[in-house]
Swiss-Prot record:
Keyword Transferase: yes
Signal peptide feature range: none
Protein name: Mono(ADP-ribosyl)transferase SpvB
Any single GO CC term annotated in Swiss-Prot or TrEMBL for this entry: cytoplasm
Length: 593
């Protein structure tokens, strides 16, 4: 909708087109090993600032996995150390923290004994007692607190990570989020993050699928294998409608919560035709890959038969969107598959609106990342052909697209000198790589905002010029919150300089009780947002900051010329309704200099 001074009725339910906000630009090389790397973000909706921080990462030194050779999408985990040999699954084993650092047991003191026995966490009581042992990284850098919980009745074990920012992470609370020996459930090799909660009661819940024999030929070398150890990330749900201070998994293995957002990892359970939007509910059993393989570093077989075919972003706003599960974004992954080695060769982002789809513009074609050599399969082995291509928009168009979808309110309030949500502004700049910390100095924040606003303006100026000579803008001058700001619109001859981005439209449907009838001259800097716009139906023409407008005439309801001017505008077929609705017409002209 058309925006004035940051006022809008936009909500989280509105569909945001996909873009690649981070990474994906070029292969990078760092460190003495010279490994090539690249990052491809996932189509994750921003929510209220607490969304999963997931992406696809490529390393030319990486092994095979659910995304093909070299690629991974790692969630937070804690694992037993294997660099010194197969774990013994007793007190002699060492653990690796989420950052890969070796964990050591915290010293026990009289004031802080370690370990301790716990029967509850906060207000939540447990049906059994737990032995809780505190750990810390051998080399301290993150300043988090780690606790290893072991049930004294059933032996179930999990980890709690207390982050320095107050967020609590629960890893491996249920068997679904633990990678264990199928023949000895107590031999847990990895604990995967299963739930996170902020001090404000915002939650993220991670679901996993266990490997099985679906669509696998169980004859030959596949016969007799126990393939149930592997865990695949299936869903990430966040945006709980009602805040909750305690972890849901304390009291339920499957939280019955109204989630507003779900990120789905699809392994072939849904169709991959780009013309057909896939459903939220899986329709088929997952597909088997051509190059299954096994890992044995934990002392038991971890067999992998699956490839992630696509990543889907769903919104759940049934009242606003008319359906329970609305697909809004999609990352479609294409592979060069063969029995020797499978490579990810292409990635496409698609956005969905209603019954149609739109593919992100092709602005950049990437060279193929060099894969590791395939395993030797006799003398005739050859490397699979690479067809890698990544699609990405320019940083300036990304900034403009985000402004149209969510950023307009903060940016325009900031530019006009009004009160603005500073925390939200910092989170936006941090999430879009304009800041490297969420606690910048005033100078760092000011410089980051300047760069971000300049990128929006450059993205706008890169759009095609338009032949429109008249655009419209609807104001509500009688609105108390705007009366002081807009009093300059009431004097003929005034030259108004709008410090913010100014939203207009050639469509007369978006007017209020006051019409700004804006005449344009050749060479003006307004641009129709078109495909970049979030609100597609408005035909929005956006002007950059500091646009000058001169008031040429003001025609109020009841004046001699009002009926004539209103008739010329031809707002609708109902002249009486227009007269009752419209209170004044302000004729203005954009000054190009």
């Amino acid at each position: 909708m058309l925006i004035l001074n940051g006022f809008s009725s936009a909500t989280l339910a509105l569909i945001t087109p996909p873009f690649l906000p981070k990474g994906g630009k070029a292969l990078s090389q760092s460190g003495p090993d010279g490994l090539a790397s690249i990052t491809l973000p996932l189509p994750i909706s921003a929510e209220r600032g607490f969304a999963p921080a997931l992406a696809l990462h490529y390393s030319s030194g990486g092994g095979n996995g659910p995304f093909g050779v070299g690629w991974s999408c790692a969630t937070m985990s804690i694992a037993r150390r294997t660099s010194h040999g197969v774990p013994q699954y007793n007190d002699s084993d060492e653990f690796l923290g989420p950052d890969g650092e070796v964990l050591v047991q915290t010293l026990s003191t009289g004031d802080a004994p370690n370990p301790v026995t716990c029967f509850a966490y906060g207000d939540v009581s447990f049906p059994q007692s737990y032995t809780v042992t505190r750990y810390q990284p051998r080399t301290e850098s993150s300043f988090y607190r780690l606790e290893y919980w072991v049930g004294n009745s059933n032996g179930d074990d999990f980890w709690l990570l207390h982050d320095s920012n107050g967020i609590l992470h629960l890893l491996g609370k249920t068997a679904a989020a633990r990678l264990s020996d199928p023949q000895a459930a107590s031999h847990t090799a990895q604990w995967l993050v299963e739930e996170s909660v902020t001090p404000a009661g915002e939650h993220i819940y991670y679901s996993y699928l266990a490997e099985n024999g679906d669509n696998v030929d169980l004859n030959g070398n596949e016969a007799g294998r126990d393939r149930s150890a592997m865990r695949y990330l299936s869903k990430v749900q966040y945006g709980n409608a009602t805040p909750a201070a305690d972890l849901y998994l304390w009291t339920s293995a499957t939280p019955a919560v109204q989630w507003l957002f779900t990120l789905v990892f699809d392994y072939g359970e849904r169709g991959v035709d780009p013309q057909v939007p896939p459903a939220f509910t899986a329709q088929n059993s997952w597909l088997a890959r051509q190059d299954p393989f096994s890992l044995y570093n934990y002392g038991f077989e971890i067999r992998l038969h699956r490839l992630c075919r696509q990543v889907l972003m769903f919104h759940h706003f049934p009242d606003e969107l008319g359906e329970a599960d609305t697909l809004v974004s999609r990352l479609l992954l294409e592979y060069d598959e063969n029995p020797i080695l499978t490579q990810l060769c292409a990635a496409r982002t698609l956005a969905y609106e209603g019954d149609g789809y739109r593919r992100a513009p092709v602005n950049n074609m990437m060279p193929p990342p060099p894969p590791p050599p395939p395993p030797m399969m006799g003398g005739n082995s050859s490397r699979p052909k690479s067809k890698w291509a990544i699609v990405e928009e320019s940083k300036q168009i990304q900034a403009l697209r985000y402004y149209s979808a969510q950023g307009y309110s903060v940016i325009n309030k900031y530019l006009r000198g009004d009160d603005y949500p500073e925390t939200q502004a910092k989170e936006t700049l941090l999430s879009r790589d304009y800041l490297s910390t969420n606690e910048p100095s005033d100078e760092e924040f000011k410089n980051a905002m300047s760069v971000y606003i300049n990128d929006i303006a450059e993205g706008l100026s890169s759009l095609p010029e338009t032949d429109h000579r008249v655009v419209y803008r609807g104001l509500k001058l009688d609105k108390p919150a705007l009366s002081d700001v807009l009093k300059e619109y009431t004097t003929i001859g005034n030259i108004i300089i709008d410090k913010a981005f100014m939203s207009t439209s050639p469509d007369k449907a978006w007017i209020n009780d006051t019409i700004l009838n804006i005449y344009l001259e050749k060479g003006h800097k307004g641009r129709i947002l078109g495909d970049v716009a979030h609100f597609k139906g408005e035909a929005e023409m956006l002007f950059p900051p500091n646009t000058k407008l001169k008031i040429e005439s003001i025609v109020n309801c009841g004046s001699q010329d009002f009926a004539s001017q209103l008739s010329k505008l031809r707002l609708s077929d109902d002249a009486t309704a227009d007269t009752n609705r419209i209170k004044r017409i302000i004729n203005m002209r954009v000054l190009n200099s």
